[in-house]
């Protein structure tokens, strides 16, 4: 077993030469296992949760390169981020031998059953640095920059293929004995003020958040967020999240777009911008099958359509001609017999 790591969602490449350097004699027989770095459900359902590493079928880009979708450390439920505070890397594992899983194609859904046409989805731009704790406990960390000495800081965010409907979530924290106010300014316009309570004997830090509609202040794809807190108060940013409606296009810079339409529950048609000759579509959250191909039909020279049974699932459209990054090689993993280990107080897997 060889461990590889990623830190963010994305399409990653495994090349024949890299696999050989990892020690595999026959890269065509290499198999990929894992479920990435998303935080696992805190309530495990025996009927739906898989209790072992799942094999991920690889997409063969060419004779010397295989592609796969990797989950990073964070995902979204609506406009709420769900992050994994227990890991800094998302782990996958490679092995050689046996028959690698085949990347199957989902059964085609008749176009006549499609109820909606979907060409946009809600995307999120997150600014967050977990560098500081108000108390030596808990799992939420805060930005390393203190607002006590300089109570105004600016942050730059950039959207991709925005179709409007922007909103901004500001989450802030304070560790001061006096109450704190935080003014949010977006592209030169004040949009709202947060209020945070004071600390006390048993309260080491307070938090507050708010979401503001900011679409009226758009200036292209560039967003400057300026936060000003009560002068002299000890306070720190938790995170900024810019939510917006994004067109389903495959950008040339990264070569893929990941999307879903959770507000739709009936068969629908996705319209995806990209070169029909080189665009492929994966569903990456099918139960017990982490990756399956979805059939597409060319609409014109710049887009394709795909009729899907469940538009609320997660899909990834990617360009097979793009040069994708490789995961980080960590090393070989020795076999372990955890059942033979004694004197344990607690095990977290």
Task: Identify the meaning behind each predicted range.
Residues 12:
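Ligand-binding face of N-terminal immunoglobulin V-set domains in extracellular IgSF glycoproteins
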Residues 1-6, 17, 22-349:
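Structured catalytic cores of large enzymes
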């Amino acid at each position: 077993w060889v461990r590889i790591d990623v830190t963010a969602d994305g399409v990653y490449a495994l090349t024949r030469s890299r696999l050989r350097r990892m020690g595999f004699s026959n890269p065509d027989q290499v198999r990929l296992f894992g479920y990435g770095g998303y935080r696992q459900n805190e309530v495990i359902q025996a009927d739906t949760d898989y209790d072992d590493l799942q094999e991920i079928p690889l997409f063969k880009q060419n004779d010397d390169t295989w592609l796969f979708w990797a989950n990073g450390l964070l995902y979204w439920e609506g406009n709420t981020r769900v992050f994994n505070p227990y890991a800094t890397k998302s782990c996958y594992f490679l092995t050689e031998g046996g028959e690698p899983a085949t990347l199957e194609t989902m059964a085609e859904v008749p176009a006549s059953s499609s109820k909606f046409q979907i060409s946009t989805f809600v995307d999120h731009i997150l600014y967050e640095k977990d560098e500081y704790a108000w108390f030596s406990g808990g799992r939420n960390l805060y930005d390393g920059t203190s607002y006590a000495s300089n109570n105004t800081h600016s942050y730059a965010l950039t959207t991709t293929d925005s179709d409007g409907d922007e909103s901004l979530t500001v989450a802030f924290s304070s560790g001061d004995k006096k109450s704190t106010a935080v003014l949010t300014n977006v592209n030169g316009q004040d949009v709202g003020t947060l209020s945070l309570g004071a600390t006390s004997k048993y309260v080491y830090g307070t938090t507050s958040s708010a979401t503001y509609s900011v679409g009226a202040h758009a200036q292209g794809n560039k967003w400057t967020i300026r936060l000003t807190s009560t002068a002299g108060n000890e306070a720190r940013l938790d995170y900024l999240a810019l939510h917006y409606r994004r067109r389903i296009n495959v950008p040339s810079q990264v070569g893929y777009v990941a999307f879903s339409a959770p507000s739709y529950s009936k068969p629908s048609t996705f319209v995806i911008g990209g070169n029909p000759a080189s665009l492929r579509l994966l569903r990456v959250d099918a139960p017990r099958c982490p990756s399956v191909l979805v059939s597409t039909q060319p609409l014109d020279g710049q887009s394709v359509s795909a009729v899907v049974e469940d538009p609320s699932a997660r899909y990834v459209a990617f360009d097979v001609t793009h040069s994708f990054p490789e995961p980080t090689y960590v090393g070989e993993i020795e076999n372990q017999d955890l059942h033979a280990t004694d004197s344990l107080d607690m095990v977290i897997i």
